[in-house]
């Protein structure tokens, strides 16, 4: 059953990407971030009240720092969705597992522990190199279409997501529940979006265009909650790994959405790069789980 919950979560995140792509034609990135945050706050506050969860935290500074990193990643992801094929933007954002694996390898090398440099790191290094080779293949068509900058921003969204995830790991080790973490991230998102709107301005309001805004926060919150449910139902390490790898089904959903709704034309070399990233990211997830077997669910 946990597999169904994770596939549902991936579907919800991909559907949120569709809403972002449509809404980006009428609203700037700061507005999208703001509405995603405000609606997320309302939804998570209602959920916490219904479930009897307290939103009072002992580590506000850690939540604030997580929000800063997360907002940067989210803004970059929304920009990439607006300017790249949906599946391409989703794939680049889902590279957070690869970035985390790269951090683990880099940390082992910096610590200078001989045991960490041995064969145990070899497969992880190969997975990282394969993933970045996939990025080159994936972004090659984008460069031909003058989308190189958007591709770079999309790549940075995955890097930011990796930093945010490591902060979530630190927060979870202090006993903070997922509901509270998601709530305070939504608060930070709303505040950052409001500040951004003060700089970038507010777009003309049209109720037909605004219909794309409510799903942003709702789908994101539902996606995170169903992902958490999937992880919580995993009874052993193998089940957790299966759930973690099923998150990449979101790329498949995004590809289908892109073909059906937006007519995205991704050349064969782009599909090959996407497949290589998915395979290497799954490998990195499995190998990374050995270093952090009790890590919390990743957020998007």
Q: Can you say where each PLM-predicted feature lies in the sequence?
A:
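Helix-helix packing/entry segments at the starts of transmembrane helices
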Residues: 89-95, 175-188, 225-257, 287
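Specific alpha-helical transmembrane segments that line the substrate/conduction pathway
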Residues: 31-34, 38, 81-116, 240-257
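Loop-to-transmembrane-helix transition segments
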Residues: 1-9, 49-78, 149-157, 204-222, ...
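C-terminal-most transmembrane helix of multi-pass membrane proteins
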Residues: 111, 244-300
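Transmembrane alpha-helices of multi-pass small-molecule transport proteins
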Residues: 2, 27-72, 100-103, 160-164, ...
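Cytoplasmic-side transmembrane-helix entry/capping segments in multi-pass membrane proteins
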Residues: 6-7, 58-69, 116-131, 150-155, ...
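Transmembrane alpha-helical segments that form core, pore/gating elements
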Residues: 44, 142-204, 296-300
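Hydrophobic transmembrane alpha-helices of multi-pass small-molecule transport proteins
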Residues: 102-105, 120-140, 269-288
